[in-house]
From Swiss-Prot:
GO MF annotation, one: NAD binding
Protein known as: Truncated formate dehydrogenase 2
InterPro entries cross-referenced by the UniProt entry: D-isomer_DH_CS, D-isomer_DH_NAD-bd, NAD(P)-bd_dom_sf
Site residues by UniProt (Important for catalytic activity): 132, 185
Binding site for NAD(+): 36-37, 57, 104-108, 130, 156, 185-188
Classification via PROSITE patterns: D_2_HYDROXYACID_DH_2, D_2_HYDROXYACID_DH_3
Pfam families registered for this protein in UniProt: 2-Hacid_dh_C
Amino acid sequence: MVVINKQLMVSGILPAWLKNEYDLEDKIISTVGAGRIGYRVLERLVAFNPKKLLYYDYQELPAEAINRLNEASKLFNGRGDIVQRVEKLEDMVAQSDVVTINCPLHKDSRGLFNKKLISHMKDGAYLVNTARGAICVAEDVAEAVKSGKLAGYGGDVWDKQPAPKDHPWRTMDNKDHVGNAMTVHISGTSLHAQKRYAQGVKNILNSYFSKKFDYRPQDIIVQNGSYATRAYGQKK
């Protein structure tokens, strides 16, 4: 919006597509994946007074986590019980105004959002992918934006990085010449983010070379030849 506002200030012309601008208030918003990142997305969405917050995950959120979201919504928005788990992905996207992707990339999620799954989404819904680009089929997303099936697609991740010049996500748009909110994977370039990365690497190296091996659980991905976390596709 900062870029758009600057363009408006220079041109003085109000673009026609602004007539299709909506708030998140009273909308049904969902997340694919409700782990550490997905849950934080839900926390932030409460402030926009959504009608429902849906999530799709192989396991339920702890009751305490759900209660925290519902209580915040009731306190600030006057309505509780907005959080709901949906067991079938097709059912969730069919009722969502906005779908956000917050799950890891693994064999079961690669190409998950293809033409078939997108066909189950509401006409004019928005799809936001800040997880991994390859979770979506690039050509299918571009076609959905062009046809108007999706009102828009946004993300900071690409299925190929750096994206080739002819990548469909570079130029896709709809009849109003909008619907494309792609950025070039720069969400982690803030000074604060870089400091966190550096500190995390330092902690891991110090733990290893001191032979303490007291790693934080979230820093361990593989242990004893298998995944140490259930975030990469394994359900047991």
